[in-house]
A protein has these predicted regions:
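C-terminal engagement/docking regions of AAA+ P-loop ATPases
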Residues: 1-27, 37-53, 225, 230-237, ...
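Walker A/P-loop NTP-binding motif of AAA+ ATPase domains
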Residues: 3-224, 230, 242
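Amphipathic alpha-helical interface segments
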Residues: 241-245, 249
Length: 320
């Protein structure tokens, strides 16, 4: 378990591209009620911070980044709860650890308790599961929303359980009931992918040259088109691989000319071009055709659940 101060979290909402609608809903539904309770409760007793928020969708779409930014922007104390923290070999010790987590959260409130891959620790209860696992889930739910969940003056505690998963169907129904705010973070559509490209490449030198036929050497529209089916993480890695191509070329040219590598200068490296994304080591090239189609099919189960959100349903295009 890690207790993190908001100032120690380096991620803000400005660092996340393509999820503006979800970010605005998180501000209105979580941050403001959590940090300005007097404003919301003074208007209506219904306007309290939610007891739980669930971010679900395919891997690499920004769920963990949203959680970090939410903790930073809210100014609330952030508890990063690892699954291993709740696991002990002695009978009953895991229950005590759960109670200790909530005791700390109450003393530090407003608090956000983040559980990544929440389905692994709070999955569906089954008749054949180990007794200790069932007791941990029962203790967690009791501390979260039970007789001891209110403050000493009878008010609502300002503790928000924030979970992230790509297997929402495996989470116990009682847990889902305690998480009234659910946000699908699905694969980005064209406009979202463009925002991700713009944000990722904002500090990268771009080749502004125009070809003889009028096409730009760096065509972001082409990248947006062929990256359909890629997650935000995939796009970032593709940009990272592409940004290395001009540097690799410059180093190779220096070696061939016999010049001293100590004299290498960053300003002599050419700008990024569209072709850098499709070379032998280009990130998009590696995800194109069969590999990308297999990846997309493997995500269908989660994608169907998340399709009600702002995700992409576009067909993947090949780049010739």
């Amino acid at each position: 378990m890690e207790v993190v101060s908001p100032g120690e979290i380096p991620v803000t909402f400005e660092d996340i591209g393509g999820l503006d609608e979800i970010i605005e809903e998180l501000r209105e539904g979580v941050i403001y009620p959590l940090t300005l309770p007097h404003l919301y409760s003074g208007h209506s007793s219904l306007l309290t911070a939610p007891s739980g928020v669930l971010l679900y969708g395919p891997p690499g779409c920004g769920k963990t980044m949203l959680a970090k930014a939410l903790a930073r922007e809210s100014g609330a104390c952030f508890i990063n709860l690892h699954i291993s923290t709740l696991t002990e070999k002695w009978y009953g010790d895991s229950n005590k650890l759960v109670a200790a987590v909530f005791s700390i959260a109450r003393k530090l409130q407003p608090t956000i308790v983040f559980i990544d891959e929440i389905d692994a620790v709070l999955g569906q209860r089954r008749s054949g599961e180990h007794e200790a696992s069932g007791m941990v889930k029962a203790e967690f739910m009791t501390q979260w929303d039970g007789l001891t969940s209110a403050t000493t003056d009878g008010g609502n505690q300002r503790i928000c359980i924030l979970g992230a998963t790509n297997r929402i169907q495996d989470i116990d129904e009682a847990i889902l009931r305690r998480m009234p705010k659910k946000f699908p973070v699905s694969l980005p559509n064209a406009s979202q992918r463009r925002q991700i490209f713009d944000l990722t490449l904002k500090d990268t030198r771009i080749d502004a040259t125009v070809c003889s036929d009028g096409r730009p050497v760096f065509d972001i529209s082409a990248l947006v088109r062929v990256s359909a089916g890629m997650s935000g993480s995939d796009i970032k890695e593709a940009c990272r691989d592409a940004a290395m191509v001009p540097v690799r070329e410059h180093i190779k040219a220096l070696k061939q000319s016999g010049r001293n590598m100590r004299g290498i200068r960053a300003e002599n490296v050419r700008g990024l071009q569209t072709e850098d994304f499709f070379g032998r080591r280009g990130g998009i090239h590696q995800l194109q055709q069969q590999d990308l189609k297999k990846t997309t099919r493997s995500r269908d189960e989660v994608h169907e659940v998340a399709s009600a959100g702002s995700g992409s349903t576009e067909q993947v295009d090949d780049f010739d």
